Design a protein with these regions (language model features):
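Extracytoplasmic beta-rich repeat domains
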Residues: 142-144
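Extended substrate-binding grooves/exosites of carbohydrate-active enzymes
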Residues: 1-138, 147-168
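Edge beta-strands of extracellular beta-sandwich domains
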Residues: 166-177
Length: 178
């Protein structure tokens, strides 16, 4: 039983799961585990939180909780991966969503891969208001998982993803202090 259940790990798991489903048109039925977090007696895993991947804090509210849902138990927080499925399954509503938004700190001047879930035909990425990347398609099998190489700046960094229709999402990441 592991005390660390990072949302980003869940994202990678579901991205892989969805890609396999998209590449298997012969499947008559597919499902995901599970829509909502739910209580489980005698469970003490996934109880540690971190907003920087370095410092960890025990969160007693997550004790006795299966936290693998795509929405929290109280239905207040739609986890990143919820937007993967929203982008993939709902083509009527354009979605643009930057993942890893609860990982609020990263090392300054470091490059990293930013993931965006979107059913838009193309995306532009801005860093502090300056366009830094553009893509007209994703090679990923579901067609909704976009990866962009971006770089943190020295101070607070605001990344914004924008579709041609103006649908957008943005996150602010702060520099990790040594």
């Amino acid at each position: 039983t592991d005390s660390l259940h990072f949302e980003e790990y869940g994202n990678r798991f579901h991205e892989s799961h969805a890609a396999q489903i998209a590449q298997s048109p012969y499947l008559n039925f597919t499902s995901l585990w599970v829509l909502f977090d739910f209580p489980v007696a005698e469970r003490e895993e996934g109880i540690v939180d971190s907003d920087n991947g370095v410092d960890f804090v025990v969160n007693p509210e997550r004790k006795y909780l299966n936290d693998k849902g795509i929405v929290t138990r109280d239905r207040k927080l739609f986890k990143d991966v919820f937007y993967l499925y929203k982008s993939w399954w709902n083509k009527d509503v354009e979605t643009v969503y930057i993942t890893a938004r609860r990982l609020k700190y990263r090392p300054a001047n470091q490059e990293f891969v930013m993931t965006v879930y979107s059913n838009a035909p193309s995306l532009k990425i801005y860093c502090n208001g300056v366009e830094v990347a553009e893509s007209t398609k994703t090679e990923e099998p579901t067609g909704v998982v976009w990866k962009f190489n971006v770089k943190m700046v020295t101070g607070p960094t605001v990344f914004k993803a924008v579709s041609p229709n103006g649908t957008s999402d943005e996150i602010e990441i702060l520099p990790l202090q040594d």
